[in-house]
Amino acid sequence: MKVLVDTNVILDVLCNRKEFVADSLRVFQCCEAQRITGYISALSIPNIVYIMRKELDTEKIREILHTLTMVFSVVELRESDLLKAAELPFDDYEDAIQSVCATRVRADYIVTRNEKDFVNSPVQAISPTGLLKQF
């Protein structure tokens, strides 16, 4: 199974968001163990760094980036992705980019806590909890 993991799920783990960390961490671990083929979009990386920069030093951020690129394949952004995303019926351009990336890698799901934001995505959105129920 191939999944594109949305930025919020990664941040649940990195920020230890009590309400969400358990299932998000299990998804992360399934990708790490290669039980699931995990992808993140290149867009997620600068967003993660931007959010984490206030709490972590540069070295720790480098370690996190190294770990992320070991666990997940990073889907590069192409000019055509940006243009396709702009044409999709999404309220949020970043979500549209995630959808385009998921489509390009033929992901089975977009793993996100914001399923409602992806109702117009050709790739079905699923919560971490929903994904884990399939195992």
Q: What is each PLM-predicted segment?
A:
Residues 1-40, 53-60, 120, 135:
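Short, well-structured N-terminal submotif of metal-dependent ribonuclease cores
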Residues 2, 71, 103-135:
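Acidic, PIN/NYN-like endoribonuclease modules and their adjacent C-terminal/linker elements
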Residues 3, 41-45, 78:
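N-terminal alpha-helical segment
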Residues 10, 45, 82, 118, ...:
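A generic structural signal for short hydrophobic patches within well-formed alpha-helices
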Residues 25, 45-73, 80-81:
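Active-site-proximal, substrate-binding regions of enzyme catalytic domains
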Residues 29-32, 66-70, 86, 103, ...:
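Alpha-helix boundary recognition
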Residues 39, 75, 126:
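General small-molecule cofactor/ligand-binding pocket signal
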Residues 73-115:
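Active-site neighborhoods of divalent-metal-dependent phosphate/nucleic-acid chemistry enzymes
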